Amino acid sequence: MRNYLVKNGPKPRFYALLAAPLLVILSSISVAADGDFVPRTADQKPDFNGIWQAIGSAHWNIEPHAADFSPLVELGAIGAIPAGLGIVEGGSIPYTSEARAKQQENRADWLALDPVVKCYMPGVPRATYLPFPFQIIQSPDHVVMAYEFASASRIVYMDRPDFEAPIFSWMGHSRGHFEEDSLVIDVTDQVPDTWLDRAGNHHSDALRVTERYTHVGPNTLMYEATLEDPNVYTQSWTLKFPLYRRLDENMQILEFKCVEFTEELIYGHLRKGANAE
């Protein structure tokens, strides 16, 4: 049997064909290990310019969740909440008991209470995993994040580490720096009104978010955000998910101001005859 295998086994050319894909794989691993896929700016910083988008159901609930009915049952399947594995490391946000009770209250009436429903700015990190693309525009001194939802935006100050926020705001105050090939952004001074998702996950005005953007492929970033808020959480916690570059031809951020879609929701009761029988 041993002689038969030697005599009639694969020819050298067959071995060469098997080896070729292996060499490609090993070459790819080598490139990835060397970080050669990381694009560079003119000053050799990692280049994050582009239009990016998250894929998933984290905008419904960042914790693991089953599929559920929509609060508007008339919408049927198209309004149903999709299941999700969650993006919170460890699976659960470490709330205080009072803060968890507040989250449950929020969730029970999210359609009336979620600020995003009324087109308020989503805040950070929520803006990153809404089902809308966003654009990163990078220069040596600033990084601009332009979000399609509500035309929200923020400026990351790369050259002013001591610049304090003059006021609290919906998108907070962002200061950034590089740690090796990662873009790290410190976000503070957000108003306490923003939520983290439609499930009512929340924070106070003491929230501090440390974001980290890292290239893990030519068209993929890994996004991490560590949240600290001693008024709401018992310890710091991290959420993590990939962002994908939008490669659509002529891809651009389009207008979705959304205010015009909420006017009736917010001001409809003031319309003449609105309460008429």
Functional labels for PLM-detected ranges:
Residues 15-28:
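Bacterial N-terminal signal peptides
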Residues 1-15:
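N-terminal secretory signal peptides that target proteins for export/translocation
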Residues 2-3, 30-277:
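PEST-like low-complexity, intrinsically disordered acidic/proline/serine-rich tracts
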